[in-house]
Amino acid sequence: MELSSPSREEYPMPRGRVGIMAASLMGLLLLHTVSWVSGARPCSPKSFGYSSVVCVCNGTYCDSLDPLTLPDPGTFSRFESTRSGRRMELSLGTIQANRTGTGLLLTLQPDQKFQKVKGFGGAMTDAAALNILALSPAARNLLLKSYFSEEGIEYNIIRVPMASCDFSIRTYTYDDSPDDFQLLNFSLPEEDVKLKIPLIHQALELANRSVSLFASPWTSPTWLKTNGAVNGKGTLKGQAGDLYHKTWARYFVKFLDAYAEHKLRFWAVTAENEPTAGLLTGYPFQCLGFTPEHQRDFIARDLGPILANSTHRDVRLLMLDDQRLLLPRWAQVVLADPEAAKYVHGIAVHWYLDFLAPAKATLGETHRLFPNTMLFASEACVGSKFWEQSVRLGSWDRGMRYSHSIITNLLYHVVGWTDWNLALNPEGGPNWVRNFVDSPIIVDIAKDTFYKQPMFYHLGHFSKFIPEGSQRVGLVASKKSDLDTVALLRPDGSAVAVVLNRSSKDVPLTIKDPAVGFMETVSPGYSIHTYLWRRQ
């Protein structure tokens, strides 16, 4: 069944919270709801029996947002998503000269400045590209608009696997000709030329913002490896500085050359996706093992100099690209060597073992030791652990896990956050080793339909409102609460605050900006809000 734009009766207009008159608790809450205007279209909700809903999209209908505009001076915008089904709904409030509420006070400290943000995005894997391209052109366009356009959540980062990974339907590298040390047979296969590259171009055309690409390899060609296989325990043959290592470093340059021929240039490359994976016996999918010492020497003697002496010398090099549990030691080993450190722009981290690795002891300590080396979250997904269901359509909890991670990362100096697959099928694939996981967008090819999950909107509460160049500033709470909060100043001088409530309790709060006054509001249980206001 094709969906048309829902009528007012089917989906009543959001009513905001003007009805809250508990003056003793909050004062008059001066928020009024903005009706859906111009291009914005409401969510077409569907429940699959989990904690919240997905928004259903097809070739004729998809929910959308208006291009972001700053509220008038003296007012603030509040964008709300809730477990009960609101999705980035806009209401406006008036900034007060005096505080009327008695709940939690969050005070902006604009002089307390921290890291500048690079951005937010996801990965164009083979699996993501296969799913997106299986949609009709109209539905495909709406999916990419949802992620990249002003009517969507305005991603500005795309991760590109260098050749195959587990989210491929076959194993391949860009040069599977044995002992081709000159890389004469290096070539991009159909996965790049017909799947990923056309979709990346379409995304860039739809985006109003500048979009940065970064690439990560999973495995080298097998003839460069000790075990002669794409997976399992194996490293590069020989040692740093030799023919094997130099050939592997030149493979990076060949990749960048090949994409440049397709008019795509990269912001960064990571030295290796999850280098510890290739140190594990029986590792099931593509990997290439490095210890921190091996990565240090490979960067210092091979990858660093070869990139620097190529036409891609401006491409940034990110080390680690693995669990933050490995910090700060991995950074200490690599960055203690000035020959390696001079080539390293940043440290990329994955989220899978975060429950074993407190942010303060890992990210915080690494920033303390290396304040000039940026931290960047390069991969996250839910559903990968053996006890987890791969896909849970409409899970609010999974959305909260994303936003909690993003806020925690921002509070510990991380400059960007990258989701894993941009889109998967209802099984959580395809994946050649059946390592199925969840994704913010699930594509049902048979119905030419895709589902935008709570994870999509949780990410959007950051990506749409925190453009590249925004700077995190202090936001101090008057007392302990159940809220996760973060504040930033945007390049246009306006301020943005994100408030996540993972508890069931409504939390009355006031946001104070010393430059303009007080914003009285409430954070309902199981909700996320983004606040935006001018500071002058």
From Swiss-Prot:
Pfam families membership: Glyco_hydro_30 (PF02055), Glyco_hydro_30C (PF17189)
Catalytic activity: a beta-D-glucosyl-(1<->1')-N-acylsphing-4-enine + H2O = an N-acylsphing-4-enine + D-glucose; a beta-D-galactosyl-(1<->1')-N-acylsphing-4-enine + H2O = an N-acylsphing-4-enine + D-galactose; cholesteryl 3-beta-D-glucoside + H2O = cholesterol + D-glucose; a beta-D-glucosyl-(1<->1')-N-acylsphing-4-enine + cholesterol = cholesteryl 3-beta-D-glucoside + an N-acylsphing-4-enine
Main location: membrane
Compartments where located: Lysosome membrane
Glycosylation sites: 58, 98, 185, 208, 309, 501
UniProt GO BP: autophagy; cholesterol metabolic process; glucosylceramide catabolic process; lipid glycosylation; lysosome organization; regulation of TOR signaling
EC number: 3.2.1.45, 2.4.1.-, 3.2.1.-, 3.2.1.46
Its membrane topology: Peripheral membrane protein
Signal sequence bounds: 1-39
Sorted UniProt keywords: Cholesterol metabolism, Disulfide bond, Glycoprotein, Glycosidase, Glycosyltransferase, Hydrolase, Lipid metabolism, Lysosome, Membrane, Signal, Sphingolipid metabolism, Steroid metabolism, Sterol metabolism, Transferase
GO molecular function: galactosylceramidase activity; glucosylceramidase activity; glucosyltransferase activity; steryl-beta-glucosidase activity
Disulfides per UniProt: 43-55, 57-62
GO CC, one annotated term: trans-Golgi network
Pathway annotation: Steroid metabolism; cholesterol metabolism; Sphingolipid metabolism
Source domain of life: Eukaryota
Residues annotated as the enzyme's active site: 274 (proton donor), 379 (nucleophile)
PANTHER family listed in its UniProt record: GLUCOSYLCERAMIDASE, LYSOSOMAL ACID GLUCOSYLCERAMIDASE
Function description: Glucosylceramidase that catalyzes, within the lysosomal compartment, the hydrolysis of glucosylceramides/GlcCers (such as beta-D-glucosyl-(1<->1')-N-acylsphing-4-enine) into free ceramides (such as N-acylsphing-4-enine) and glucose. Plays a central role in the degradation of complex lipids and the turnover of cellular membranes. Through the production of ceramides, participates in the PKC-activated salvage pathway of ceramide formation. Catalyzes the glucosylation of cholesterol, through a transglucosylation reaction where glucose is transferred from GlcCer to cholesterol.
Family: Belongs to the glycosyl hydrolase 30 family.
Assembly behavior: Interacts with saposin-C. Interacts with SCARB2. Interacts with TCP1. Interacts with GRN; this interaction prevents aggregation of GBA1-SCARB2 complex via interaction with HSPA1A upon stress.
Protein name: Lysosomal acid glucosylceramidase
Source species of the chain: Bos taurus (Bovine)
